[in-house]
C-alpha cells in the first residue's frame, strides 16, 4: 500500500477520534527496544474498554522449555476457538500474533502510545527529562523509532487533531513488568530486567481534547501500516532474532468453552533452527459472562552464534474455526436489543399460556424431548404449545431452536436478563412459572395486558 493511502487512513481515523460511544475504550500501542543494540524487540497494539481488558509481558529471559520431542511444523490448524480469530504468523525474522473478536470495534477510539527500552542492567540515573539527541545516543534509537513520519503527522492534523513534534521526553524506569490493563490477572514482574519509559512532553502552550502527542499518531500509523481491521483486539509483532518469552492476557465479554492447549515445535523452513513453545488457556466465567484467555509463547535459538537467515515461506498457525462474520461495523448493543425484543414477545405469549394452565412452562431447552402438540384458545387466536411424556409443558421458539444446543447458549441467554426466566443449567432448561391470581387481578385492573 502506498504512503498516500496510509495518509488517507490516518486522516480518516483522526477525523473520528474519540467519537466512540464507549468512553473507556482505548487502543494502547507499545514499542520496546533493546538497550544494548537499539533494535526493536516487540511492538504491540491492545484494545481495552470497560469490559475488555488486555495486557502483556515481554522478557528476554527464557526459562527451560519442555523436554518432550519437538514437532516440525509446516502449517497448523487447530480449531480451539469458534468465537474469536487467533493466528500466529512466522515470516522472515518476524513473528506476528493477531487476535480478532466481534466484541471489539476500534472505530472512533482514542489511541495512546508507549515507548520503552528494555535493559538487562540498571543504567546510571538519568535526568527526569532528556532531549531527542540524548535519547538516540544513550539508547541507540533512531529518530524514526521515536516519531512517526512527518507526512503522517500532517495527515493527522488534517483530520482535526493537533500534533507537534516534541523536543523533550520524560524518563522513568522500573523493573520489567506487565503492560496494559494488568487487572486481568496478577501482573508479572522481573527483578533481573529494567524498563525505561520515554514519554513525550507536550510542545504546545495551549492544549485541548484534540491535542495529542506524536506517539498517539504513531499508534494510528501502526493500525494503518499493519492493515489492522476495526475488530482487532490484540496485535503483537516480535523480533524473532533473539530468544524471548511473551505472555498475553485478555478478558473478552463473551462465554467460550474452557480449553487448554500446548505445543513444542520447530519450523520446517528455518535455516537457523529455533525452538518454540506455545501454551493457551481459556477460562470462562459464567457469572460475569466473560472469558479470560492466557497465551504464553517462548522462542529459544538453538544456534545463537549462527548467522540468522530469513524464512522464505510464510508459515501460519491458526487456532480458530469461525462461524460468524467479521469486519461488520455496527452498534454492539443493537443486536442484543433486537434479541431482547424478540424474547419479550416470546415470553409474553408463553406467560399467557402458562397462567392459563397454571403450570411451569419451558421456553428453551438444549435437550430434544419427544413432544406432542397441544393448543390453547385465546379469544380468536390459537396458541400452540407442546407436552412431553411426563406432562411437562413447552412453549418453544423456532428462532431459539436455531441456536446451538450447549451451555454457552444458556449463558448467552442468561446475559440478556429476562426477569421472569428461571435457569436450570443442570437440566439444560429455561422456564417460567404461572403468576398468582392476585397478580393477574392486579394486572387486569391496571390494563397491562
From Swiss-Prot:
Superkingdom, taxonomy of origin: Viruses
InterPro entries: NS-S_bunyaviral, NS-S_N_bunyaviral, NS-S_WIV_bunyaviral
Signal peptide bounds: none
TM region positions: none
Family per similarity comment: Belongs to the tospovirus NS-S protein family.
Function: Forms filamentous inclusion bodies.
Name assigned to this protein: Non-structural protein NS-S
Organism in which the protein naturally occurs: Impatiens necrotic spot virus
Amino acid at each position: 500500500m502506498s504512503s498516500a493511502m496510509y495518509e488517507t487512513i490516518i486522516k480518516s481515523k483522526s477525523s473520528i477520534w474519540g467519537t466512540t460511544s464507549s468512553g473507556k475504550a482505548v487502543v494502547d500501542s507499545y514499542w520496546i527496544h533493546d538497550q544494548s543494540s537499539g533494535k526493536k524487540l516487540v511492538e504491540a497494539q491492545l484494545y481495552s474498554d470497560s469490559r475488555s481488558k488486555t495486557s502483556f509481558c515481554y522478557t528476554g529471559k527464557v526459562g527451560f522449555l519442555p523436554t518432550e520431542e519437538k514437532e516440525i511444523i509446516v502449517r497448523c490448524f487447530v480449531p480451539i476457538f469458534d468465537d474469536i480469530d487467533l493466528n500466529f504468523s512466522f515470516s522472515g525474522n518476524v513473528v506476528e500474533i493477531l487476535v480478532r473478536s466481534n466484541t471489539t470495534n476500534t472505530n472512533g477510539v482514542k489511541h495512546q502510545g508507549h515507548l520503552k527500552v528494555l535493559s538487562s542492567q540498571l543504567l546510571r540515573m538519568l535526568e527526569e527529562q532528556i532531549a531527542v539527541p540524548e535519547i538516540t545516543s544513550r539508547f541507540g534509537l533512531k529518530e524514526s523509532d521515536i516519531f512517526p513520519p512527518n507526512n503522517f503527522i500532517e495527515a493527522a492534523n488534517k483530520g482535526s487533531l493537533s500534533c507537534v513534534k516534541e523536543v523533550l521526553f520524560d524518563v522513568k524506569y522500573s523493573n520489567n513488568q506487565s503492560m496494559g490493563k494488568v487487572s486481568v490477572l496478577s501482573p508479572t514482574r522481573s527483578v533481573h530486567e529494567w524498563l525505561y519509559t520515554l514519554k513525550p512532553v507536550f510542545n504546545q502552550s495551549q492544549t485541548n481534547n484534540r491535542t495529542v502527542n506524536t506517539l498517539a499518531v504513531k499508534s494510528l500509523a501502526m493500525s494503518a501500516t499493519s492493515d489492522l481491521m476495526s475488530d482487532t483486539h490484540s496485535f503483537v509483532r516480535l523480533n524473532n532474532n533473539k530468544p524471548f518469552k511473551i505472555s498475553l492476557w485478555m478478558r473478552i465479554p463473551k462465554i467460550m468453552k474452557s480449553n487448554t492447549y500446548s505445543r513444542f515445535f520447530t519450523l520446517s523452513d528455518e535455516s537457523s533452527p529455533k525452538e518454540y513453545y506455545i501454551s493457551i488457556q481459556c477460562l470462562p466465567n459464567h457469572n460475569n459472562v466473560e472469558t479470560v484467555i492466557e497465551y504464553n509463547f517462548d522462542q529459544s535459538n538453538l544456534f545463537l552464534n549462527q548467522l540468522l537467515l530469513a524464512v522464505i515461506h510464510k508459515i501460519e498457525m491458526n487456532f480458530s474455526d469461525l462461524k460468524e462474520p467479521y469486519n461488520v461495523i455496527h452498534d454492539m448493543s443493537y443486536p442484543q436489543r433486537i434479541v431482547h425484543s424478540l424474547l419479550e414477545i416470546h415470553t409474553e405469549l408463553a406467560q399467557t399460556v402458562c397462567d392459563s394452565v397454571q403450570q411451569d412452562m419451558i421456553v428453551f431447552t438444549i435437550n430434544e424431548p419427544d413432544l406432542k402438540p397441544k393448543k390453547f384458545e385465546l379469544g380468536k387466536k390459537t396458541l400452540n404449545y407442546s407436552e412431553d411424556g411426563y406432562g411437562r409443558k413447552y412453549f418453544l421458539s423456532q428462532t431459539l431452536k436455531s441456536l446451538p444446543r450447549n451451555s454457552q447458549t444458556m449463558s448467552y441467554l442468561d446475559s440478556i436478563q429476562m426477569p421472569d426466566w428461571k435457569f436450570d443449567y443442570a437440566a439444560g432448561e429455561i422456564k417460567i412459572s404461572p403468576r398468582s391470581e392476585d397478580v393477574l387481578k392486579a394486572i387486569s385492573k391496571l390494563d397491562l395486558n
